[in-house]
């Protein structure tokens, strides 16, 4: 559980900067220059967590309800929603306990609070790792479906998908336990940062290659229809925009947190890095925002899933 106040503590003692007292303040660092510090109110954390919680519960419920959605691709999307769901549950639980403790409505011994803090940290770290893994798995699944379409159902089988899903969850749990235990070791932090960079590179390479193939296919159709420029340019712009949104959201939501981890290793005492450390809460809020955006990008674009969601909302089980 974080230290009471506006500055949260995640994954042990990753951040030890003093709490901010205003929504937007300029906090001086040790050398005198001004640091821009954005404080995120607990109410905003709670609201973001609840929105993400509802969205991802709906995704999981829709996939569980509709047999047509029970395929490897949708299982990966479902697991991504479950990972984001863990982020939301951890955030809501953490914020609720913080507010109750601050209000004096909950009395707990320090040892109990510490144990609860450890559980929440494991949930948050595990959900982060699993989210990144399933984002990568979805990218690989889409790549195979495009470049190996005829062999897709023999390559991406249900048993193989289940083994991949099980391996990701086990690896995420072990990683979170190791990270919580050895969070103050440089190697552990660098491994996490390296993992993020690897996932970003994997997604960028696969999606760029898929966009290139799609544009090539569009050019072929355009030549047959003798309308090369309008079709190709329009399709290319639409594909580039989709790719920019997909990778941009991923980088903007996850990048600042892993930048924070990198700077802990590279310049823990430097004043400029100290300015970045002060915005740790903002980085956590961005991760929660990613849990809100993921269903919009990966799940709600499916017409079949949207139709099932309507049935779920109407309680027509």
UniProtKB/Swiss-Prot annotation:
GO terms for molecular function: melanocyte-stimulating hormone receptor activity. Residues 64-72, 141-163, 212-240, 301-317 are cytoplasmic. PROSITE patterns: G_PROTEIN_RECEP_F1_1 (PS00237), G_PROTEIN_RECEP_F1_2 (PS50262). Keywords: Cell membrane, G-protein coupled receptor, Glycoprotein, Lipoprotein, Membrane, Palmitate, Receptor, Transducer, Transmembrane, Transmembrane helix. It is found in: Cell membrane. The chain crosses the membrane at residues 38-63, 73-93, 119-140, 164-183, 192-211, 241-266, 280-300. This is Melanocyte-stimulating hormone receptor.
């Amino acid at each position: 559980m974080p230290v009471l106040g506006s500055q949260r503590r995640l994954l042990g003692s990753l951040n030890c900067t003093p709490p901010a007292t205003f929504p937007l303040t300029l906090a001086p660092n040790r050398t005198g220059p001004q640091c821009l510090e954005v404080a995120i109110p607990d109410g905003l954390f709670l609201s973001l967590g609840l929105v993400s919680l509802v969205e991802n519960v709906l995704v999981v419920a829709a996939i569980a309800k509709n047999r047509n959605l029970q395929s490897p691709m949708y299982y990966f999307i479902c697991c991504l929603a479950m990972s984001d769901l863990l982020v939301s549950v951890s955030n809501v639980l953490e914020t609720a306990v913080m507010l109750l403790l601050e209000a004096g409505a909950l009395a707990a011994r320090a040892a109990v609070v510490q144990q609860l803090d450890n559980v929440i940290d494991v949930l948050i770290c595990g959900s982060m790792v699993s989210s990144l893994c399933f984002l990568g798995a979805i990218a690989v699944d889409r790549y195979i479906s495009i470049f190996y379409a005829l062999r897709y159902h023999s390559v991406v089988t249900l048993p193989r998908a289940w083994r991949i899903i099980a391996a990701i969850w086990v690896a995420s749990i072990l990683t979170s336990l190791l990270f919580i235990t050895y969070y103050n070791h440089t190697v552990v932090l660098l491994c996490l940062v390296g993992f993020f960079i690897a996932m970003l590179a994997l997604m960028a390479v696969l999606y760029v290659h898929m966009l290139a193939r799609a544009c090539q296919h569009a050019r072929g159709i355009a030549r047959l229809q003798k309308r090369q420029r309008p079709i190709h340019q329009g399709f290319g712009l639409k594909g580039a925009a989709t790719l920019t949104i997909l990778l941009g959201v991923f980088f903007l939501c996850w990048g600042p947190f892993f930048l924070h981890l990198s700077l802990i290793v590279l310049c823990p005492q430097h004043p400029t890095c100290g300015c970045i450390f002060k915005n740790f809460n903002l980085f956590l809020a961005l991760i929660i925002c990613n849990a809100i955006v993921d269903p919009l990008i990966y799940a709600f674009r499916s017409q079949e899933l949207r139709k099932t969601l309507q049935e779920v909302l109407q309680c027509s089980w």
